Amino acid sequence: MNRILKQVSNTKGKGIRFYSSSSQLDSEYMFPSVRRLLVEYGINSSKEVTATGPQNRLLKGDVLAYIKTKNLSPVDRLSLIASSVKSSQPSSSSSPSIVDSPTLTSQIKDQIKIVTTITNDKNKSKVIYEDIPNNNIRRVIATKLSQSKQQVPHFYMTVECELDNVLAMRKSMPENVKISVNDFVLRACALALRDNPQANSKWSDEHGEAILNPTVDISFAVSTDRGLITPIITNTDKKQLLAISNESKQLALKARDGKLKPEEFIGGTFSVSNLGMFGITSFNAIINYPQAGILAIGTGRKVLRPPSTYQPIETNLNASYGSEGKSEIINTNGPLTTEQLEKLFDNTVSKKQDIKQQIINEQPQPPKYEQPKVANVMDVTLSGDNRVFDDEIAGKFLSSFKYYLSNPQNMIL
């Protein structure tokens, strides 16, 4: 027999009372939709509603009309059950729980268990966690990154650069000279900015146009315990590779020790962020506002390069069998003499095996083709301010950067 849950109030407090459909709801033939409406709107008894159906049966329309007349609203069943459970639970722990009542349907039991769990959880102690406050550097970084992402129209371009020549040059250097791949990257970036001055610009909100920077000052990202710092190598394009390497090491050490002066990390005209040491293939960096561009450097990886051409690079199509392998033609206008017959026999019979072997040895060889090769490459992604960079400027800058990195001998001149 179906049961429904009813909330009642009396002088002793609130409780849960269950009614049989044959008693308070008066009819065993009540439609499910009617029963659902009675429960949803907190109508305690079907007697409150005037039935107009056959054999005095309560119809859905009757309940809807009653709801409209009384201007009723659906009740919060979970709140209803929660308050009922709280007031109905006995004080003694040995008393049976109301959830164990045999008169409850399984659905209502599940709801009561859920609400009881929520109620009990509220009484438990809160989860302990550690709140790590931001330091001043992290606050400044968060403000600048938010400002950059919200106000600067970012766009992205990626180019693949070969590292074979850079790696070969590093290997050929003396052991006491320690120049990293990132030093080559900084030098290549500086020269590319020098060759493409429009890429070394910034946007002026005051003038509403891009302004060229007079110097090439590259910021490079350094991770510290206090946050990400970007020390600046001033006049990078005018410094040789070894000078850039030494200065970047000194600035990185000072950044980790917290000893950088303001002029050593505030400013800059362009930035480089390298995550290759973490195995990151490629990523998009946020522009270091008010700069207009930043290069995101990925890790080096090996790829298989197909041949640049599929035409033969070496052939042996003009092989000759030699004079000994050729049949000698004997011209005569008359009958062959004995001497001529012997000579002809020698050329065609006695040397047959030698001629055959010589022909086999001097057969034309198949043509040789250029073979695929393994190359070391890395992806470099430019994040640019689209107010300063257009496609042509960005393309020329990345092309110059790729050229210098692929031909490092031009960076030490």
From Swiss-Prot:
Gene3D superfamilies: Chloramphenicol acetyltransferase-like domain, E3-binding domain. Residues 29-67 form the Peripheral subunit-binding (PSBD) domain. One of its GO terms (biological process) is glycolytic process. The keyword Kinase does not apply. Residues 1-19 form a transit peptide. Keywords: Glycolysis, Mitochondrion, Transit peptide. Pfam families: 2-oxoacid_dh, E3_binding. Its main location: mitochondrion. It is found in: Mitochondrion. GO terms for cellular component: mitochondrion; pyruvate dehydrogenase complex. Disulfide bonds: none annotated. One of its GO terms (molecular function) is acyltransferase activity. The keyword Transit peptide applies. The pyruvate dehydrogenase complex catalyzes the overall conversion of pyruvate to acetyl-CoA and CO(2). It contains multiple copies of three enzymatic components: pyruvate dehydrogenase (E1), dihydrolipoamide acetyltransferase (E2) and lipoamide dehydrogenase (E3). Belongs to the 2-oxoacid dehydrogenase family. PANTHER family: DIHYDROLIPOAMIDE ACETYL/SUCCINYL-TRANSFERASE-RELATED, DIHYDROLIPOYLLYSINE-RESIDUE ACETYLTRANSFERASE COMPONENT OF PYRUVATE DEHYDROGENASE COMPLEX, MITOCHONDRIAL-RELATED. This is Pyruvate dehydrogenase complex subunit homolog DDB_G0271564, mitochondrial.
